[in-house]
């Protein structure tokens, strides 16, 4: 029954992610069409800074996930969780108001507006994250998927309205980054309201006294803080190149650079559902079972991303047809797309294993070292070449370094197998660069990359594929129901 439940959970979350993917595709291509480059650049600056707001939950949501992962929702103490919810609402509201006041008092121009909106967003986004982590911890993946779908459908409707306005009134004052951000935040507030109603049993009503639970709240913060810092440092590694381009180049150059990552996010939206389901499932496994899963999980993610890289070809045509003023973004996209195979392994598989092994402090150190390396690599790239593309290549080098030091600790201490997956990933990275750069005929380029992908995949993962097929036969014959 466990295997079938896991498959169902992955399907439910993946369906929500597919709907989110559709929304990301629409946003990714329509928003830069209806906003001018300057406004799009300001919008992407906003999205860059909201990626840091997770620091301001101070580990509370991660502590909730770590302490309650694997439990059933009915096992949660209602009165205690009502206190946790009230505490977190107050905490985030205080920092949100402080952020808005600071932006108004100390900043000027467009950055004042952007940072004030970032500060407001931290309230909605962190509270939504709190409820999402409760869904994830208690394996209530239906609510998690519904949340994704509501947000995606609402965002699609918003973009559709703006597209209609753009077609009818191309110079409308509504076609600005500020209007879109405010409208998006209204959607977030509505989504938060839905969560309050859905989880009303742990939100409203009689609650435990703070004095009785202050030690538990401190434990939640203590448990989650290191994980949060590790996660945010890892996020800094991921966005280091964008931060450099944002700081060192004009807003239009940054808009084109950020657009490349906007396209990339369409792919990541589809595969992140696996990590959502994985943590509570792995936490229920024995140590040996989890360690055996590691190389298979790494292989699954890498193969999926490598096949997804075939999307580079149609995406290139769509951009050239629909958004020719973003044609420069395609070179950045071509450089960073293969890096996704390595970053996905780190953020989806490796990070999950550090969590279940309770080695968040080690992962923090790994990410801190990687962050320093990434910073130095970007500095060197800019000092020598002074181009956004050189910073993209520096991002590839720093990601390889990050991958190696993060898996070497697991290999040394837990004997996980990783070398085959790394060799596979690097082979496909090289294959992608070679086929997209040196083969001018697109049909031959696609065929060559696909042939290399299939041959290397079968050569390295033939045994793993056979095991997957065998397990599926067992499930279809009913053996999976008895496990």
Which residue stretches match the model-derived regions?
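Membrane-proximal transmembrane or re-entrant/amphipathic helices at the cytosolic face
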Residues: 204-205, 422, 434-483
């Amino acid at each position: 029954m466990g295997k079938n439940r896991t498959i169902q959970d992955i399907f439910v979350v993946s369906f929500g992610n597919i709907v989110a993917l559709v929304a990301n595709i629409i946003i990714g291509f329509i928003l830069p069409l209806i906003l001018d480059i300057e406004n799009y650049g300001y919008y992407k600056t906003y999205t860059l800074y909201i990626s840091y707001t997770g620091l301001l939950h101070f580990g509370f949501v991660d502590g909730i996930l770590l302490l309650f992962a694997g439990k059933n929702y009915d096992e949660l103490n209602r009165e205690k969780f009502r206190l946790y919810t009230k505490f977190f609402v107050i905490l985030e509201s205080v920092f949100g108001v402080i952020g808005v006041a600071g932006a108004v008092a100390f900043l000027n121009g467009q950055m004042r507006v952007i940072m004030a909106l970032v500060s407001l967003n931290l309230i909605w986004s962190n509270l939504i994250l709190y409820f999402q982590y409760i869904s994830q911890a208690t394996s209530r993946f239906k609510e998690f998927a519904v949340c994704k779908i509501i947000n995606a459908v609402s965002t699609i409707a918003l973009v559709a309205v703006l597209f209609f306005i753009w077609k009818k009134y191309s110079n409308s004052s509504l076609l600005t980054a500020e209007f879109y951000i405010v409208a998006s935040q209204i959607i977030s507030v509505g989504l938060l309201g839905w969560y309050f109603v859905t989880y009303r049993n742990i939100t409203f009503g009689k609650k435990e006294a703070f004095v009785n639970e202050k030690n538990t709240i401190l434990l939640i913060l203590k448990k989650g803080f290191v994980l949060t810092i590790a996660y945010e440092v890892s996020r800094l590694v991921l966005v280091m190149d964008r931060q450099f381009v944002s700081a060192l180049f004009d807003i239009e150059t940054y808009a084109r650079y950020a657009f490349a990552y906007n396209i990339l996010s369409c792919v990541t939206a589809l595969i992140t559902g696996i990590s959502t389901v994985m943590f509570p499932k792995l936490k229920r496994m024995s140590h040996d079972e989890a360690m055996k899963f590691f190389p298979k999980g790494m292989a699954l993610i890498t193969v999926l991303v490598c096949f997804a890289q075939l999307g580079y070809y149609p995406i290139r045509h769509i951009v050239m047809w629909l958004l020719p003023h973003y044609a420069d973004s395609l070179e950045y996209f071509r450089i960073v797309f293969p890096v996704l195979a390595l970053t996905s392994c780190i953020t989806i598989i490796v990070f999950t294993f550090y969590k279940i092994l309770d080695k968040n402090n080690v992962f923090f150190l790994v990410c801190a070292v990687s962050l320093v390396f990434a910073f130095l690599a970007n500095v060197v790239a800019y000092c020598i070449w002074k181009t956004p593309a050189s910073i993209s290549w520096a991002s590839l080098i720093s990601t390889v370094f990050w991958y190696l030091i993060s898996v070497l600790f697991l290999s040394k201490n837990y004997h996980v197998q990783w070398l085959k997956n790394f060799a596979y990933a690097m082979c496909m990275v090289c294959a992608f660069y070679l086929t997209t750069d040196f083969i001018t005929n697109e049909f031959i380029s696609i065929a060559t990359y696909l042939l290399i992908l299939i041959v290397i995949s079968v050569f390295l993962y033939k045994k793993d594929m056979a095991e997957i097929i065998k397990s599926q036969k067992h499930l279809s014959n009913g053996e999976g129901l008895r496990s």
